[in-house]
Protein backbone atom coordinates (compact mmCIF):
# COMPACT_ATOMS: atom_id res chain seq x y z
CA UNK A 1 0.00 0.00 0.00
CA UNK A 2 1.41 3.40 -0.96
CA UNK A 3 2.12 6.07 1.66
CA UNK A 4 -0.46 8.85 2.09
CA UNK A 5 0.88 12.08 0.61
CA UNK A 6 -2.22 14.27 0.97
CA UNK A 7 -5.41 13.56 2.89
CA UNK A 8 -8.86 14.31 1.46
CA UNK A 9 -11.19 16.24 3.74
CA UNK A 10 -14.06 14.08 5.00
CA UNK A 11 -17.11 16.05 6.08
CA UNK A 12 -18.70 12.82 7.32
CA UNK A 13 -16.12 12.56 10.10
CA UNK A 14 -16.28 15.77 12.11
CA UNK A 15 -13.76 16.29 14.90
CA UNK A 16 -15.30 19.54 16.13
CA UNK A 17 -19.01 20.13 15.58
CA UNK A 18 -18.41 23.91 15.74
CA UNK A 19 -16.51 23.66 12.46
CA UNK A 20 -19.51 22.12 10.73
CA UNK A 21 -22.10 24.44 12.27
CA UNK A 22 -20.00 27.51 11.43
CA UNK A 23 -19.52 26.36 7.84
CA UNK A 24 -23.26 25.86 7.47
CA UNK A 25 -24.01 29.25 9.01
CA UNK A 26 -21.58 31.08 6.74
CA UNK A 27 -22.76 29.37 3.57
CA UNK A 28 -26.42 29.95 4.45
CA UNK A 29 -25.85 33.68 4.77
CA UNK A 30 -23.72 34.10 1.63
CA UNK A 31 -24.26 37.40 -0.19
CA UNK A 32 -22.69 39.71 -2.76
CA UNK A 33 -22.72 43.49 -2.94
CA UNK A 34 -24.04 43.39 -6.51
CA UNK A 35 -27.41 42.24 -5.18
CA UNK A 36 -27.99 45.46 -3.21
CA UNK A 37 -29.58 48.40 -5.14
CA UNK A 38 -27.18 51.07 -3.88
CA UNK A 39 -28.29 53.58 -6.51
CA UNK A 40 -31.59 53.89 -4.64
CA UNK A 41 -29.66 55.86 -2.01
CA UNK A 42 -28.57 58.60 -4.40
CA UNK A 43 -31.40 60.96 -3.43
CA UNK A 44 -30.47 60.63 0.25
CA UNK A 45 -26.80 61.13 -0.59
CA UNK A 46 -27.45 64.37 -2.47
CA UNK A 47 -29.23 65.77 0.58
CA UNK A 48 -26.24 65.25 2.87
CA UNK A 49 -23.89 68.14 3.60
CA UNK A 50 -20.34 68.07 2.25
CA UNK A 51 -19.09 67.45 5.78
CA UNK A 52 -21.38 64.43 6.14
CA UNK A 53 -20.29 63.05 2.77
CA UNK A 54 -16.66 63.46 3.79
CA UNK A 55 -17.33 61.62 7.06
CA UNK A 56 -19.04 58.68 5.34
CA UNK A 57 -16.24 58.37 2.80
CA UNK A 58 -13.53 58.33 5.45
CA UNK A 59 -15.41 55.84 7.61
CA UNK A 60 -15.74 53.45 4.69
CA UNK A 61 -12.13 54.06 3.70
CA UNK A 62 -11.03 52.93 7.16
CA UNK A 63 -13.25 49.87 7.01
CA UNK A 64 -11.85 49.00 3.58
CA UNK A 65 -8.34 49.11 5.02
CA UNK A 66 -9.19 46.69 7.83
CA UNK A 67 -11.03 44.27 5.54
CA UNK A 68 -8.14 44.35 3.08
CA UNK A 69 -5.67 43.49 5.81
CA UNK A 70 -7.88 40.75 7.20
CA UNK A 71 -8.36 39.14 3.78
CA UNK A 72 -4.68 39.37 2.84
CA UNK A 73 -2.84 38.87 6.14
CA UNK A 74 -5.20 38.07 8.98
CA UNK A 75 -6.69 34.76 7.91
CA UNK A 76 -3.36 33.58 6.53
CA UNK A 77 -1.75 34.30 9.89
CA UNK A 78 -4.03 31.96 11.81
CA UNK A 79 -4.28 29.31 9.09
CA UNK A 80 -0.97 27.68 10.09
CA UNK A 81 -2.37 26.64 13.47
CA UNK A 82 -5.62 24.93 12.49
CA UNK A 83 -6.68 21.92 14.54
CA UNK A 84 -8.82 20.23 11.90
CA UNK A 85 -9.10 20.22 8.10
CA UNK A 86 -12.65 21.51 8.51
CA UNK A 87 -11.32 24.55 10.36
CA UNK A 88 -9.17 25.36 7.35
CA UNK A 89 -12.24 25.12 5.12
CA UNK A 90 -14.07 27.57 7.40
CA UNK A 91 -11.10 29.94 7.25
CA UNK A 92 -11.19 29.75 3.44
CA UNK A 93 -14.80 30.92 3.58
CA UNK A 94 -13.96 33.70 6.04
CA UNK A 95 -11.08 34.91 3.89
CA UNK A 96 -13.25 35.09 0.78
CA UNK A 97 -16.00 36.99 2.57
CA UNK A 98 -13.49 39.53 3.90
CA UNK A 99 -12.61 40.21 0.27
CA UNK A 100 -16.32 40.58 -0.51
CA UNK A 101 -16.61 43.09 2.34
CA UNK A 102 -13.65 45.13 1.07
CA UNK A 103 -15.05 45.10 -2.46
CA UNK A 104 -18.51 46.15 -1.25
CA UNK A 105 -17.15 49.47 0.02
CA UNK A 106 -15.78 50.18 -3.45
CA UNK A 107 -19.27 49.49 -4.81
CA UNK A 108 -20.60 52.12 -2.42
CA UNK A 109 -17.92 54.58 -3.54
CA UNK A 110 -18.53 53.99 -7.24
CA UNK A 111 -22.25 54.61 -6.72
CA UNK A 112 -22.08 57.70 -4.53
CA UNK A 113 -18.73 59.36 -5.27
CA UNK A 114 -16.88 60.85 -8.22
CA UNK A 115 -13.55 59.44 -9.39
CA UNK A 116 -11.62 62.30 -7.79
CA UNK A 117 -13.51 61.86 -4.52
CA UNK A 118 -12.70 58.14 -4.48
CA UNK A 119 -9.03 58.88 -5.08
CA UNK A 120 -9.06 61.38 -2.22
CA UNK A 121 -10.69 58.84 0.12
CA UNK A 122 -8.02 56.23 -0.55
CA UNK A 123 -5.23 58.80 -0.34
CA UNK A 124 -6.52 59.80 3.10
CA UNK A 125 -6.97 56.18 4.20
CA UNK A 126 -3.50 55.12 3.13
CA UNK A 127 -1.85 58.05 4.91
CA UNK A 128 -3.94 58.66 8.02
CA UNK A 129 -1.74 58.37 11.09
CA UNK A 130 -4.25 56.59 13.31
CA UNK A 131 -5.60 54.18 10.70
CA UNK A 132 -2.08 53.17 9.76
CA UNK A 133 -1.12 52.79 13.42
CA UNK A 134 -4.11 50.52 13.96
CA UNK A 135 -3.15 48.41 10.96
CA UNK A 136 0.48 48.23 12.09
CA UNK A 137 -0.40 47.10 15.62
CA UNK A 138 -2.56 44.26 14.33
CA UNK A 139 -0.34 43.25 11.43
CA UNK A 140 2.78 43.16 13.62
CA UNK A 141 1.04 40.50 15.70
CA UNK A 142 0.02 38.61 12.57
CA UNK A 143 3.65 38.58 11.47
CA UNK A 144 5.43 38.04 14.81
CA UNK A 145 2.93 36.79 17.40
CA UNK A 146 2.28 33.25 18.56
CA UNK A 147 -0.84 31.29 17.61
CA UNK A 148 -2.99 32.60 20.47
CA UNK A 149 -1.86 36.19 20.07
CA UNK A 150 -2.81 36.09 16.38
CA UNK A 151 -6.29 34.84 17.26
CA UNK A 152 -6.73 37.63 19.81
CA UNK A 153 -5.65 40.26 17.28
CA UNK A 154 -8.04 38.80 14.72
CA UNK A 155 -10.95 38.69 17.16
CA UNK A 156 -10.35 42.27 18.30
CA UNK A 157 -10.29 43.38 14.66
CA UNK A 158 -13.41 41.38 13.75
CA UNK A 159 -15.32 42.85 16.66
CA UNK A 160 -14.72 46.26 18.17
CA UNK A 161 -12.33 47.69 15.55
CA UNK A 162 -14.89 47.07 12.83
CA UNK A 163 -17.86 48.05 14.95
CA UNK A 164 -16.52 51.52 15.71
CA UNK A 165 -16.80 52.18 11.97
CA UNK A 166 -20.28 50.70 11.63
CA UNK A 167 -21.85 53.39 13.83
CA UNK A 168 -22.02 56.07 11.12
CA UNK A 169 -24.04 54.18 8.47
CA UNK A 170 -26.35 52.74 11.14
CA UNK A 171 -26.86 56.25 12.50
CA UNK A 172 -28.08 57.39 9.09
CA UNK A 173 -30.30 54.32 8.83
CA UNK A 174 -31.85 55.33 12.15
CA UNK A 175 -32.65 58.66 10.54
CA UNK A 176 -34.19 56.94 7.51
CA UNK A 177 -31.27 57.70 5.19
CA UNK A 178 -28.92 55.54 3.08
CA UNK A 179 -30.98 52.40 3.73
CA UNK A 180 -29.28 50.30 1.06
CA UNK A 181 -25.80 51.30 2.19
CA UNK A 182 -26.85 50.28 5.69
CA UNK A 183 -28.16 46.97 4.33
CA UNK A 184 -24.63 46.13 3.20
CA UNK A 185 -23.32 47.08 6.63
CA UNK A 186 -25.89 44.86 8.31
CA UNK A 187 -24.82 41.95 6.12
CA UNK A 188 -21.18 42.60 7.00
CA UNK A 189 -22.03 42.76 10.70
CA UNK A 190 -23.84 39.43 10.38
CA UNK A 191 -20.68 37.91 8.91
CA UNK A 192 -18.29 39.51 11.37
CA UNK A 193 -20.29 38.28 14.34
CA UNK A 194 -19.74 34.71 13.13
CA UNK A 195 -16.08 35.31 12.25
CA UNK A 196 -15.28 36.82 15.63
CA UNK A 197 -17.19 34.17 17.56
CA UNK A 198 -15.55 31.31 15.66
CA UNK A 199 -11.98 32.55 15.93
CA UNK A 200 -12.61 33.47 19.56
CA UNK A 201 -13.81 29.92 20.19
CA UNK A 202 -10.65 28.49 18.63
CA UNK A 203 -8.64 30.82 20.86
CA UNK A 204 -10.42 29.49 23.95
CA UNK A 205 -9.46 25.92 23.07
CA UNK A 206 -5.79 26.86 23.05
CA UNK A 207 -6.04 29.18 26.04
CA UNK A 208 -7.57 26.43 28.17
CA UNK A 209 -4.50 24.28 27.52
CA UNK A 210 -2.20 26.84 29.19
CA UNK A 211 -1.14 26.62 32.80
CA UNK A 212 -2.70 29.03 35.28
CA UNK A 213 0.45 31.18 35.34
CA UNK A 214 0.56 31.24 31.53
CA UNK A 215 -3.09 32.26 31.41
CA UNK A 216 -2.49 35.12 33.84
CA UNK A 217 0.45 36.39 31.79
CA UNK A 218 -1.55 36.11 28.60
CA UNK A 219 -4.49 38.00 30.04
CA UNK A 220 -2.15 40.85 30.93
CA UNK A 221 -0.80 40.95 27.38
CA UNK A 222 -4.31 40.79 25.97
CA UNK A 223 -5.64 43.69 28.02
CA UNK A 224 -2.55 45.76 27.24
CA UNK A 225 -3.30 45.26 23.54
CA UNK A 226 -6.98 46.10 24.04
CA UNK A 227 -6.20 49.36 25.83
CA UNK A 228 -3.58 50.27 23.22
CA UNK A 229 -6.14 49.82 20.45
CA UNK A 230 -8.84 51.63 22.42
CA UNK A 231 -6.55 54.62 23.00
CA UNK A 232 -5.88 54.81 19.27
CA UNK A 233 -9.63 54.66 18.54
CA UNK A 234 -10.23 57.63 20.83
CA UNK A 235 -7.89 59.69 18.67
Residue ranges of model-derived segments:
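Non-heme di-metal
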Residues: 1-235
Amino acid sequence: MSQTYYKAINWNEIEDVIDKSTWEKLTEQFWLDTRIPLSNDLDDWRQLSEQEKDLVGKVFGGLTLLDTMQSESGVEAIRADVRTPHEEAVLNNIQFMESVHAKSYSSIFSTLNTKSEIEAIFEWTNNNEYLQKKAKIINDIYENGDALQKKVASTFLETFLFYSGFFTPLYYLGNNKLANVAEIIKLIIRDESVHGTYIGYKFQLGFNELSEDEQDAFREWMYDLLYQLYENEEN
